[in-house]
Amino acid sequence: MIQTESMLDVADNSGAKRVQCIKVLGGSHRRYAAIGDIIKVTVKEAIPRGRVKKGQVLNAVVVRTRKGVRRSDGSVIRFDVNSAVLLNASGQPIGTRIFGPVTRELRTEQFMKIVSLAPEVL
Protein backbone atom coordinates (compact mmCIF):
# COMPACT_ATOMS: atom_id res chain seq x y z
CA MET A 1 0.00 0.00 0.00
CA ILE A 2 1.79 3.05 -1.31
CA GLN A 3 0.26 6.45 -0.63
CA THR A 4 1.27 10.07 -0.99
CA GLU A 5 4.55 10.84 0.86
CA SER A 6 5.62 7.15 0.85
CA MET A 7 9.36 6.62 0.26
CA LEU A 8 10.38 3.83 -2.13
CA ASP A 9 13.67 2.28 -3.20
CA VAL A 10 14.44 2.30 -6.93
CA ALA A 11 14.88 -1.17 -8.46
CA ASP A 12 16.69 -0.14 -11.67
CA ASN A 13 19.95 1.47 -12.81
CA SER A 14 18.45 4.84 -13.80
CA GLY A 15 20.63 6.65 -11.26
CA ALA A 16 18.00 7.29 -8.57
CA LYS A 17 18.29 5.56 -5.19
CA ARG A 18 15.20 6.77 -3.29
CA VAL A 19 11.99 8.33 -4.56
CA GLN A 20 8.93 9.77 -2.85
CA CYS A 21 5.39 9.23 -4.08
CA ILE A 22 3.65 12.53 -4.72
CA LYS A 23 0.47 11.20 -6.40
CA VAL A 24 -1.29 7.88 -6.98
CA LEU A 25 -2.51 7.93 -10.58
CA GLY A 26 -5.80 6.45 -11.76
CA GLY A 27 -8.73 8.27 -10.19
CA SER A 28 -9.48 11.63 -8.64
CA HIS A 29 -9.51 10.47 -5.00
CA ARG A 30 -7.46 7.29 -5.26
CA ARG A 31 -5.55 6.78 -2.02
CA TYR A 32 -3.38 3.65 -2.32
CA ALA A 33 -1.22 2.02 -4.99
CA ALA A 34 -0.39 -1.69 -5.09
CA ILE A 35 1.99 -3.77 -7.21
CA GLY A 36 1.59 -2.90 -10.90
CA ASP A 37 0.10 0.56 -10.31
CA ILE A 38 1.62 3.73 -11.77
CA ILE A 39 2.49 6.57 -9.40
CA LYS A 40 4.02 10.03 -9.79
CA VAL A 41 7.32 10.32 -7.90
CA THR A 42 10.05 12.83 -7.19
CA VAL A 43 13.70 11.80 -6.89
CA LYS A 44 15.02 12.32 -3.33
CA GLU A 45 18.45 10.61 -3.64
CA ALA A 46 20.42 10.10 -6.84
CA ILE A 47 23.95 9.00 -7.71
CA PRO A 48 26.27 11.39 -9.55
CA ARG A 49 26.32 11.12 -13.35
CA GLY A 50 23.07 9.12 -13.43
CA ARG A 51 20.29 9.42 -15.99
CA VAL A 52 17.98 11.16 -13.50
CA LYS A 53 18.71 14.05 -11.15
CA LYS A 54 17.53 14.88 -7.65
CA GLY A 55 14.27 16.82 -7.71
CA GLN A 56 13.10 15.41 -11.04
CA VAL A 57 9.42 14.41 -11.26
CA LEU A 58 8.72 11.14 -13.09
CA ASN A 59 6.23 8.31 -13.39
CA ALA A 60 7.06 4.98 -11.76
CA VAL A 61 5.50 1.53 -11.52
CA VAL A 62 5.37 -0.19 -8.11
CA VAL A 63 7.15 -3.58 -8.33
CA ARG A 64 7.50 -4.64 -4.65
CA THR A 65 5.52 -3.73 -1.52
CA ARG A 66 5.67 -4.73 2.12
CA LYS A 67 1.88 -5.18 1.98
CA GLY A 68 2.29 -7.80 -0.73
CA VAL A 69 -0.17 -9.19 -3.23
CA ARG A 70 -2.74 -11.97 -2.72
CA ARG A 71 -3.01 -14.65 -5.38
CA SER A 72 -6.18 -16.48 -6.36
CA ASP A 73 -4.92 -19.67 -4.63
CA GLY A 74 -4.79 -17.78 -1.31
CA SER A 75 -1.03 -17.33 -1.11
CA VAL A 76 0.45 -13.91 -0.36
CA ILE A 77 3.77 -12.63 -1.76
CA ARG A 78 5.38 -10.00 0.49
CA PHE A 79 8.70 -8.17 0.28
CA ASP A 80 10.98 -6.49 2.81
CA VAL A 81 10.96 -3.10 1.04
CA ASN A 82 8.75 -0.94 -1.15
CA SER A 83 10.35 -0.58 -4.59
CA ALA A 84 9.53 1.05 -7.92
CA VAL A 85 10.91 1.20 -11.46
CA LEU A 86 11.12 4.65 -13.06
CA LEU A 87 9.32 5.21 -16.37
CA ASN A 88 9.79 7.79 -19.13
CA ALA A 89 6.94 9.78 -20.69
CA SER A 90 6.02 6.91 -23.05
CA GLY A 91 5.81 4.37 -20.20
CA GLN A 92 9.06 2.52 -20.93
CA PRO A 93 11.62 1.92 -18.14
CA ILE A 94 14.45 4.48 -17.96
CA GLY A 95 16.99 1.95 -16.67
CA THR A 96 18.44 -0.94 -18.65
CA ARG A 97 18.65 -3.35 -15.70
CA ILE A 98 16.18 -4.37 -12.98
CA PHE A 99 17.47 -5.41 -9.54
CA GLY A 100 15.65 -8.00 -7.44
CA PRO A 101 12.57 -10.12 -8.08
CA VAL A 102 9.25 -8.91 -9.49
CA THR A 103 5.83 -10.57 -9.35
CA ARG A 104 3.78 -12.22 -12.08
CA GLU A 105 1.16 -9.48 -11.67
CA LEU A 106 3.38 -7.21 -13.79
CA ARG A 107 3.05 -9.59 -16.74
CA THR A 108 0.80 -7.33 -18.81
CA GLU A 109 1.48 -5.91 -22.25
CA GLN A 110 2.37 -2.58 -20.63
CA PHE A 111 5.18 -3.94 -18.40
CA MET A 112 6.60 -6.93 -20.33
CA LYS A 113 9.91 -5.07 -20.73
CA ILE A 114 10.29 -4.92 -16.93
CA VAL A 115 9.42 -8.61 -16.56
CA SER A 116 11.95 -9.60 -19.23
CA LEU A 117 14.73 -7.52 -17.61
CA ALA A 118 14.07 -8.85 -14.08
CA PRO A 119 16.39 -11.61 -12.81
CA GLU A 120 13.50 -13.48 -11.16
CA VAL A 121 9.71 -13.51 -11.54
CA LEU A 122 7.74 -14.80 -8.55
Swiss-Prot record:
Name of the protein described by the UniProt record: Large ribosomal subunit protein uL14
Annotated Gene3D superfamilies: Ribosomal protein L14
SMART domains linked to this entry: Ribosomal_L14 (SM01374)
UniProtKB keywords: Ribonucleoprotein, Ribosomal protein, RNA-binding, rRNA-binding
Keyword Ribosomal protein: yes
Described function: Binds to 23S rRNA. Forms part of two intersubunit bridges in the 70S ribosome.
Gene Ontology cellular component annotations, sorted alphabetically: cytosolic large ribosomal subunit
Species lineage: Bacteria, Pseudomonadati, Pseudomonadota, Gammaproteobacteria, Oceanospirillales
Source species of the chain: Marinomonas sp. (strain MWYL1)
Pfam family, one: Ribosomal_L14
Domain of life: Bacteria
Cited InterPro entries: Ribosomal_uL14 (IPR000218), Ribosomal_uL14_bac-type (IPR005745), Ribosomal_uL14_CS (IPR019972), Ribosomal_uL14_sf (IPR036853)
SUPFAM superfamilies per the UniProt record, alphabetical: Ribosomal protein L14 (SSF50193)
GO molecular function: large ribosomal subunit rRNA binding; structural constituent of ribosome
Quaternary structure, from the entry: Part of the 50S ribosomal subunit. Forms a cluster with proteins L3 and L19. In the 70S ribosome, L14 and L19 interact and together make contacts with the 16S rRNA in bridges B5 and B8.
Any one GO biological process: translation
Protein family: Belongs to the universal ribosomal protein uL14 family.
